[in-house]
């Protein structure tokens, strides 16, 4: 039995008083002080971990101003505040103690657009890709690019002055910020925009907080103008945080305070809104993927690409390429980056040309390609091949792979993981190759592996050395390498921070600014935040205050992780290896990962949040001397002793009375998971939440009773076959209002599905497929076996959507094969989802033995529901290991593709069909939609894939009363719009859950693709 974890770091009374008074004064946002909420805000995309005291989620600038006004009261003068956006920073920019002000949950509105003047006004929590999706119909985009664009907020981009691919032409975020609305500590609203210097000087004479700010910045930047120009490196990725260089324009006629705030990392004010310059979308885009025999060759050849007037040149090394090959993303780009015969590709330059004149762009591209052919023929520059991508869709897939590179590096095998700490250095592009040669020599001298990729056109290369931060010696080495890289970048006239901000690396600021200019930064900080209460420890302390800076060797995630025994870390890899990349925060409703995060906007309910909580739970168990691996081994095979039952009942009673246990907070996060498994493939680290969720639930319920519904769900495969013998009787009973009311109130289940009428057994009466014995199957000759298909049943389709199975049997017959309906054998997936892992292992072993016996017959076995079929491949393998055997159950599309291989494609005509894939299917098997389309094409039918996220049902998730609202909300995110837009009778869904959700919400259902094929053939 797991122990009660009754102690968690508390929240000081002053913070609680502040939050209470904040709500009393009309704060309309959310506040959070639970340990779970604070833990999710204690990490970002960096190696650091710092626990805040509380989190607030304002809904408006007025809410932020209220926070700032109350904070200025003397009684709260010791509290500190840190703004936070998407939490994608790689250097701990938004990590701090005190109160986190999260702008991402609610402040995500696009306020107005002026296409004629080319600007848009947004709130700070708007996500970069969200904005570009909005701008696309207007023919514009927000140009600064970054790899985390589908979850990074514009407020975060402004605060770090982010940039990425294309910056040589498009510049940094600060080049596109026309003005911001910021809230100062005290509640004053500061609106910035470029001003004539005379007006700025006049504003500086006002005896107000804003006046003092204008005066300080104006005077310091004017008086130290020459020193600033002399000391700021002449780089595309210029020195920011604080950008003294660009406050005045070159002619000294214009003053813009915006430049101080961009890159300020929340140390000066809360940026709540921004007016942004938007760029017309180029009409023509071409990508040339140039392949090299070494990474050094790719680096040294990059200037040649820039001279060819390319928009951007992105470089990827062999380590990243090889990791991409092992990821789901490679499926989308493999045809665009093919191997060169008899050559090893060790480097890749992704060269983009863009513009409005197609003839001019093609002329530049063709000239480059001719020159590349000459280099290949003469064996020069290490060029071994190239491929052009003329279509926008192909180019976007290439960039999606490149964007995923950061996360892919985190999936490297072994305890040492490539980590960020010196990953965005910038040097003059002409020195990049030599600089990287020295950088590599430095890492090689320590015997480290590393991955490299980046923006070689701008002289920025992302370098991530692999270190095990659970090893104290390697943690020390990280600081040593940081110091060496600082010296190396200085040697080449570069910067340590090319695009990701300073964060915990701000301790190196004096080395780059010089002591004299660093003193000027402190004066600016003092004008905005004299008492060092906004994100203290970052950028610089205010003048006149001897305050410490954050350090590169501050407390890290590894400091906490190393407290968990190595064996436990290895066995709970899914939770331990999350590196915080945050892809699970993807805003796009059509992306399968992560539905619970999308509907709640609560990061506890994301793979990253769940992994964070489980790591802490494992650490707290270790702190109490409890080994979860030993507990798992000691679990009884079956049954529970009376003593244990009494103890669980007592513990559950105390829990219901409000007795604290951190395990309850973890349980709450796990209960929100739909177990769709999208994270197990979509996440670059392959964080499989359903796997460690099941293990957690199993251990949690050693201490606490399970709800009745868990037992009912886990035994559905036992009672469904019995109920199906009299489906009308049971349906009548289930449909009674009293039964439904009792089910919702006492069991916690709603909208219970009805059994199929007629049942599958009734539909198959007299059909040969249901009446063949094992002996008859074994007696078939080779020719007969080649034409026989074994249909594997699952509990949901066979008993609740039996027509699908019956139609598949008929389809197999129509195609000239002999279908045989195998006896039903429980799959066990429901047991796995609910954490009945011992029972699941028994179920899996029994069914695996049966299917292995069938497999020896040498006939294909096929199932129609993706989630259940894929359970045989994934969960069975984890539970049984080698005892699983070699059996293989095919999905319907896999078998059809093989069976129809020799059949020619017919002329496609008529109305389209529309394919809605199951989350588990399309993420685990990304080629499934195309495979289904190819199958339909063989019969002259067109099948279009509909891009949607999760339907919200996910097995029994949508039937649980506590999930009902979220289940319907998830459906509304993407499925409902598609169903309203498309003809229902032409919509097809492979998942039983998906079809039942459509029927529940829309009133009428959709069919399985095999049913449409049967109709087409008829």
Q: What are the language-model segments listed below?
A:
Residues 88-90, 148-155, 239-247, 314-331, ...:
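A glycine-rich phosphate-binding loop feature that marks nucleotide/adenosyl-phosphate handling sites
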Residues 46-77, 81, 99, 103-148, ...:
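N-terminal glycine-rich flavin-associated loop
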